[in-house]
């Protein structure tokens, strides 16, 4: 069971002209940086979607969920397995699987929360930005789900 890190480079975070949060974001699974170590993308949009999808996955509403990056056709696919940890599949354009591994879903969820918190705290004066509001709401929902899942164990 592998631990997946979600990396957001705070030094690269900026607001685009359309008031979207952009910067370097990628995941680290084993020694692989995916899509790449310097992947520049719309961080807040990505994390907002990931928070929602992972929450649904943890609640058992989805057996399979895809977590997308905004630029390019790169995805992280979470697949529920019977009596095992979920499988994460990293796919590049044309659905080419470059890696898959069983992951610690609790750790991954907490990594998404930590990355989201970085963005929220990096732009305290911009809480009116839609993406940041969405992240804040989704963070609260995922935290509640993680508490509920941990109580059930």
Where are these regions (language model features)?
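N-terminal low-complexity, intrinsically disordered segments
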Residues: 1-58, 62-64, 69
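Short, structured protein-protein interaction patches enriched in aromatics and acidic/basic residues
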Residues: 65-85
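Short, surface-exposed coil-to-beta transition loops
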Residues: 22, 72-75, 100
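Mixed-charge, glycine-accented linear interaction segment located at domain edges/termini
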Residues: 96-153
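DNA polymerase sliding clamps and clamp-related checkpoint/processivity subunits
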Residues: 30-37, 82, 90-103, 146
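A short, sequence-level motif marking secondary-structure junctions
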Residues: 39-46, 81-84, 105-107
């Amino acid at each position: 069971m592998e631990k997946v890190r979600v990396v957001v480079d705070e030094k690269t975070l900026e607001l685009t002209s359309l008031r979207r949060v952009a910067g370097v974001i990628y995941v680290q699974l084993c020694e692989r940086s995916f899509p790449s170590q310097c992947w520049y993308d719309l961080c807040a949009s990505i994390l907002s979607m990931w928070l929602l999808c992972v929450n649904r996955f943890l609640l058992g509403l989805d057996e399979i969920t895809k977590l997308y990056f905004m630029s390019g056709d790169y995805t992280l696919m979470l697949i529920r397995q019977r009596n095992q940890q979920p499988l994460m599949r990293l796919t590049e354009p044309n659905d080419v699987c470059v890696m898959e591994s069983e992951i610690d879903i609790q750790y991954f969820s907490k990594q998404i929360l930590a990355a989201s918190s970085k963005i929220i705290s990096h732009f305290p004066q911009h809480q009116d930005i839609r993406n940041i509001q969405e992240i804040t709401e989704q963070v609260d929902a995922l935290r509640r789900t993680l508490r509920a899942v941990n109580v059930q164990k």
